[in-house]
Swiss-Prot record:
Key words of the record: Carbohydrate metabolism, Glycoprotein, Glycosidase, Hydrolase, Polysaccharide degradation, Secreted, Signal, Xylan degradation
Main EC class the enzyme belongs to: hydrolase
Keyword ATP-binding: no
Cellular compartments per GO CC: extracellular region
Glycosylation site positions: N23, N87, N118, N142, N246, N326, N385, N404, N440, N477, N518, N679, N701
Record's protein name: Probable exo-1,4-beta-xylosidase xlnD
Pathway given in the UniProt record: Glycan degradation; xylan degradation
Active-site feature positions: D310
Entry EC no(s): 3.2.1.37
Signal peptide: 1-20
Gene (UniProt): xlnD
Molecular function terms from GO: alpha-L-arabinofuranosidase activity; xylan 1,4-beta-xylosidase activity
The protein's role, per its UniProt record: Xylan 1,4-beta-xylosidase involved in the hydrolysis of xylan, a major structural heterogeneous polysaccharide found in plant biomass representing the second most abundant polysaccharide in the biosphere, after cellulose.
Amino acid sequence: MSVAKSIAAVLVALLPGALAQANTSYVDYNVEANPDLTPQSVATIDLSFPDCENGPLSKTLVCDTSARPHDRAAALVSMFTFEELVNNTGNTSPGVPRLGLPPYQVWSEALHGLDRANFTDEGEYSWATSFPMPILTMSALNRTLINQIATIIATQGRAFNNVGRYGLDVYAPNINAFRSAMWGRGQETPGEDAYCLASAYAYEYITGIQGGVDPEHLKLVATAKHYAGYDLENWDGHSRLGNDMNITQQELSEYYTPQFLVAARDAKVHSVMCSYNAVNGVPSCANSFFLQTLLRDTFGFVEDGYVSSDCDSAYNVWNPHEFAANITGAAADSIRAGTDIDCGTTYQYYFGEAFDEQEVTRAEIERGVIRLYSNLVRLGYFDGNGSVYRDLTWNDVVTTDAWNISYEAAVEGIVLLKNDGTLPLAKSVRSVALIGPWMNVTTQLQGNYFGPAPYLISPLNAFQNSDFDVNYAFGTNISSHSTDGFSEALSAAKKSDVIIFAGGIDNTLEAEAMDRMNITWPGNQLQLIDQLSQLGKPLIVLQMGGGQVDSSSLKSNKNVNSLIWGGYPGQSGGQALLDIITGKRAPAGRLVVTQYPAEYATQFPATDMSLRPHGNNPGQTYMWYTGTPVYEFGHGLFYTTFHASLPGTGKDKTSFNIQDLLTQPHPGFANVEQMPLLNFTVTITNTGKVASDYTAMLFANTTAGPAPYPNKWLVGFDRLASLEPHRSQTMTIPVTIDSVARTDEAGNRVLYPGKYELALNNERSVVLQFVLTGREAVVFKWPVEQQQISSA
């Protein structure tokens, strides 16, 4: 019997939905954006731990805590038969019963709380904290907050794992940049800035999840996704499963991968997910340039870090990309390129045939499985009750939820877009009309990738539990064109002191496998808002959802007094919105995306990956957009006023020689370009009457080096907590050498001699000029692309 037939026999029960290659009816994944996963792939299983005291493995090296993790994992895998080896290459692995190795599920989710956990129906382990979606959390510009959230998720995840209800690897964070305003999953990301925001988010989230920077005992394993060039779902019928994105080496280096460099080199992430799409003709999961040359050889991915495919993307190497000649070839191409574990069943079902046809070796398959189990060793999977985190219980879930960080993330991230002084509400306001499809929501507060929360506070809940008299009317639905609810809404508004409308978009319009085709307010929400604005009452609009919509009509309507963006604010979202509106908390969030005018979505195809303006493309992101945004990236108002000033004496160094910078000692930094060029220090004074946090973005610009030049780019950000009126505080934003480099056409990061500016926020409230002298120099060398795997 051939190896392929032997494995097929073993996997009959394991893979009930697997396809045979003789089957000629396949889903057209060039159009369909949802993979047809087998029941085995999506299964959640009851997890347990190997018995290293009395079980079959107890006398083997894998149970020897004094041995190196790699050696322990290699010793384990060497005991597998070939069939057992192949069986354990998928996300749902059956383990090896004869060795006492339990089944394991790689696929757990932790985007903003636990998902794909085995929650109970009630009582202990029936919920976990549900934080705001990442795009709202990033708008707080608070690195510590991101790390706190990830740390809590990891604590709760380990508590669930200790009772077999959650895995030790999580498919998070999503650190793709939110390039296209129509992308359905932009809500999952830290925004449109890749170099600074996505990289900072990656670092803080990964180190929070993993328990530090490459700790000896990992808390959980984070997975940086989706690598690389993934930022569309199904725009205009272009499926994410079949997209082939044309990206220059310049923009691949500059925009689509710097966050993955930071994840690998600095945060020491232990897992990376290759994406569905192809880039320049090569599917990401069969792209040896991505997975070996860049990730391992250039970015410094940890030695036993493993690459997981996105779910079914190894299969997609054949269908629909047709990079491989058949499914067997897709499995072989993916493992040889560097995809270690298949989220799916392609490896499990087709490695036997690939082995028989000498397309793959046992050593190549072993390499990936050893990497996975090496991480499980680091996670204490084989250490029994001696594992560092084995004592975490349900009490730790309850305790960490009580820290109320979910509320803090929501209230810090909320962005005040417009305000004429109506907010915070005057003490004299007694009655409020609450209107709109986002006012009485539950799970909608959570966005996507969520599990059950301990509670969900809608805006309506929060106001009903306050001292206000509430007049509620639904008004209209997100995408409705029916005006049946208008009269009730207008009636509620007329008998109230203040009108609050909550609407925008939700996951019926933006989601995984679903992009938008426009960026307008859907349905007849604007029509209802316009009628409400004619009543002569103060009107506050809450614009909800992850992606932006064109709110220019609300911005220009003087009868719309205030406009707030609230994202997907999580379990405490309604309370956070109430507290901002009433002034219990002051807003300080800033947009981490650009709000474009509606016509932007019609000017060029969303599949155009070039950020630089060309043809009908007016440029993408705040760095290159040549039009006039409705609200800029970085926009955000306060309830008070601030004054920023440079505290220096005028003697600070403003000229730097490039060669001197790159030849200086750099203790504490792996690379000289990570050294601070300077520290941008400003004094911030609250000149108003309201205590408030203060947030800042620091931008650089220059005309040094070759054209075209970006408008500006972000080099740093920070947040000061609760600055009282008439008080001052110092803020320091380090500016690294690399952050003022530009990317040349070959993808190299280059320092160019010339004049540079650093400007604080869009208002340019403080500007610092400096000069780089000497010869231009490469600070980061981008490798020449060479593929080890060729197309069939």
